[in-house]
UniProtKB/Swiss-Prot annotation:
Keywords: Allergen, Muscle protein. The sarcoplasmic calcium-binding proteins are abundant in the muscle of arthropods, mollusks, annelids, and protochordates. Like parvalbumins, SCPs seem to be more abundant in fast contracting muscles, but no functional relationship can be established from this distribution. Coiled coil: none annotated. This is Sarcoplasmic calcium-binding protein. The keyword Acetylation does not apply.
Length: 8
């Protein structure tokens, strides 16, 4: 699966 980086 691909992981996404969430903007803070």
């Amino acid at each position: 699966v691909a992981t996404v980086s969430l903007p803070r």
